[in-house]
């Protein structure tokens, strides 16, 4: 069985291959997220404590948390659940997929472990070297949280701590740092004020245009009523002034 062992404190990862069933027996019948002592794997792992994070069987089916079986089952999964990507599916569509249970069995080919507690001796490639993170946080609030900054502190100075320098394809030395997102600067505040002022101006213009239209509409309706009443008055006067027709005997 292969072991993918990761050390979050150093950022290193290493693949180990162990074929001895006596050593592997300590991991059998254990569940996902359960901690296992590494003493059974050998003297070099003495004192280490590993946490089981996942695994795959020989056919590539992954382990799923919450499925209490050591074998393989077919579950009706929807998009967003673990072990199912769901790309290209309709909204809300579910598919029946094969997954392994969360209990470790001899059928597994790969088991993913994370070092929870360091042991007595160093493991080469895992605990003796430290691999710095390539990318730090981009969001301003996350940078403040990382460096324990207040609202008054300038975040832009602290991004240079994880600015990386490298040589590009042309042979030039280039430095690169992430662009800070959601950064509040005097320019962004000025733009926000301009947006709000523009919105207020547009609302005032719309209200004045609506009032002018109502005035125009009222005057046009009044003119229409006046014309109609005038035409009716003319009609009545014409009818009253016309001579009466003689009645036939």
UniProtKB/Swiss-Prot annotation:
Gene that this polypeptide is encoded by: RPS6B
Species of the source: Arabidopsis thaliana (Mouse-ear cress)
Composition skew (Basic and acidic residues), residue ranges: 220-233
GO terms classed as biological process: translation
Pfam family, one: Ribosomal_S6e
Keyword Aminoacyl-tRNA synthetase among UniProt keywords: no
Keyword list, A-Z: Phosphoprotein, Ribonucleoprotein, Ribosomal protein
Protein family according to the UniProt entry: Belongs to the eukaryotic ribosomal protein eS6 family.
InterPro entries in the record: Ribosomal_eS6, Ribosomal_eS6-like, Ribosomal_eS6_CS
PTMs per UniProt: Ribosomal protein S6 is the major substrate of protein kinases in eukaryote ribosomes.
Protein name, as recorded: Small ribosomal subunit protein eS6y
MF annotations from Gene Ontology: mRNA binding; structural constituent of ribosome
Annotated region described as Disordered, given as residue ranges: 219-249
GO cellular component, one term: cytosolic small ribosomal subunit
Phosphoserine, modified sites: 237
Function description: Component of the 40S small ribosomal subunit. Plays an important role in controlling cell growth and proliferation through the selective translation of particular classes of mRNA.
SMART domains associated with the record: Ribosomal_S6e (SM01405)
């Amino acid at each position: 069985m292969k072991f993918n062992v990761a050390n979050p404190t150093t950022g290193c990862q290493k693949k180990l291959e162990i074929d001895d069933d006596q050593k592997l027996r300590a991991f059998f019948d254990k569940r996902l997220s359960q901690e296992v002592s590494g003493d059974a794997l050998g003297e070099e792992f003495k004192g280490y404590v590993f946490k089981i994070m996942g695994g795959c069987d020989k056919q590539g089916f992954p382990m799923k948390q919450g499925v209490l079986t050591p074998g393989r089952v077919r579950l009706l999964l929807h998009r967003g659940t673990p072990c199912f990507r769901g790309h290209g599916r309709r909204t809300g569509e579910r598919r029946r997929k094969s997954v392994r249970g969360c209990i470790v069995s001899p059928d597994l080919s790969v088991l993913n472990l994370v070092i929870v507690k360091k042991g007595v001796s160093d493991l080469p490639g895992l605990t003796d070297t430290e691999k710095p993170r390539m990318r730090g946080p981009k969001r301003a609030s996350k940078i403040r949280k990382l460096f324990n900054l207040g609202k008054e502190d300038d975040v832009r100075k602290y991004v240079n701590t994880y600015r990386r320098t490298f040589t590009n394809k042309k042979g030039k030395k280039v430095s690169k740092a992430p662009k800070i997102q959601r950064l509040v600067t005097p320019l962004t505040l000025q733009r926000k004020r301009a947006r709000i002022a523009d919105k207020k101006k547009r609302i005032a213009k719309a209200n004045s245009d609506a009032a002018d239209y109502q005035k125009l509409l009222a005057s046009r309706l009044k003119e229409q009523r006046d014309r109609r009443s005038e035409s009716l008055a003319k009609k009545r006067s014409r009818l009253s002034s016309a001579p009466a027709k003689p009645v036939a005997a």
